[in-house]
Design a protein with these regions (language model features):
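Residue-level recognition of alpha-helical structural elements
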Residues: 67-70, 152, 216
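HTH-adjacent hinge/linker in prokaryotic transcriptional regulators
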Residues: 1-73
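Short, flexible micro-motifs
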Residues: 18, 28, 91-93, 142, ...
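Glycine-rich phosphate-binding loops that contact phosphosugars or nucleotide phosphates
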Residues: 79-199, 203-213
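Conserved small/polar residues in nucleotide/adenosyl-binding loops
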Residues: 218-225
Length: 228
């Protein structure tokens, strides 16, 4: 339900809905909706035995949590930003790296960092013309939070990609996208998929070229990139 639709049903303005959400402690209507979904979903504190179809359930829940109005604002931030820096570590770095490569093919200055030193060097060079996309399932990855804090102090906009729920990174961000990433146990090994992050990154890219495709410079990836 979009904010305009809710406002129409309540016979108030969209701005009144947003103000009410902020009074409740949320950054806006999108965060309020995400928190409401979190309350409706049964939390899973410990890993549980999984079935292959459980991953599809997580993907479906993630799709349900994508607010189009938030995506539109992030797409605009990507378009208007001088540089786009992606911060991600571990398994989350692959989706970030893929998004950076895709943005580079259309002429955007996009770079992905998975090293704390490089993240902090990057963050110290940013300005209010730049954008940081920070990927952390937990939203509590200390390396990313430290770099994001520096980037925010420099005036850069911050978009977080985290698991559904309250966390430090989403609380810092200007815009938030959430995934549903359940902890599973496969053959005694804890597993948490990152395919939802990759899906969100892919969706953002395709929404971007759908919106701004007519004014983009496309550069074909090198044979080395296409075979990697």
């Amino acid at each position: 339900l979009k904010v305009t639709e809710l406002a129409d049903r309540l016979f108030i303005s969209p701005a009144s809905v947003v103000r009410f959400c902020k009074k409740l402690g949320f950054s806006g209507y999108s965060d309020f909706k995400a928190s409401l979904r979190m309350d409706l979903f049964e939390p899973e504190e410990t890993p549980r035995k999984s079935h292959p179809t459980d991953f599809f359930r997580d993907i479906h829940k993630t799709i349900e949590m994508v607010p189009e109005e938030t995506v539109e604002r992030i797409v605009e931030l990507i378009h208007c930003s001088r540089r786009i820096e992606l911060y991600a570590v571990g398994s989350s770095s692959m989706p970030g790296s893929e998004l950076a490569k895709r943005l580079q093919t259309i002429g955007k200055a996009a770079f992905c960092y998975d090293d704390s030193t490089l993240m902090n060097i990057s963050a110290r060079q940013l300005t209010s013309d730049d954008l940081v996309l920070a990927l952390s399932i937990s939203g509590e990855t200390s390396l990313i939070i430290a770099a994001a804090t520096v980037a925010k102090s420099r005036g850069a906009a911050l978009v977080s990609f985290t698991n559904l729920g309250n966390n430090t990174l989403s609380g810092m961000a200007d815009e938030n996208l959430y995934v549903n990433a359940t902890n599973f146990v496969c053959s005694g090994i804890p597993v948490q998929s990152r395919v939802q992050l990759l899906m969100l990154c892919e969706y953002l890219f395709f929404r971007y070229i759908e919106t701004y495709g007519d004014c983009l410079l496309y550069t074909s990836p090198s044979p080395r990139d296409s075979t990697s």
